[in-house]
Amino acid sequence: MPYLLQVDFPYEGPWGEEMAAAMSGLAQSIAEEPGLIWKIWTESQATQEAGGIYLFQDQPSAEAYLAMHTQRLKGFGVPRVNGKIFAVNDVLSRIDRAPL
């Protein structure tokens, strides 16, 4: 069963294309994480937040990634990381065209 991880944290930029250029190495690293199916990068310049929505193959992979990524972000000086893990209801999600 896949698991969804929702992460957000305070972020002061850069945004958009500048963020993409600055974070491309990190994105390549995340793409290699065990159990990761996909990640959607999120950003809100209006609220000064960034984060992502991740789909993992299983709960242990999501939990391990959240623990590692929280430490990594804190190492970058991020004061607070919010993370939640949810089981995915495959049947209902497929009805609504989820990319599972």
Language model features with spans:
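A common structural junction motif
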Residues: I30, T70-G77
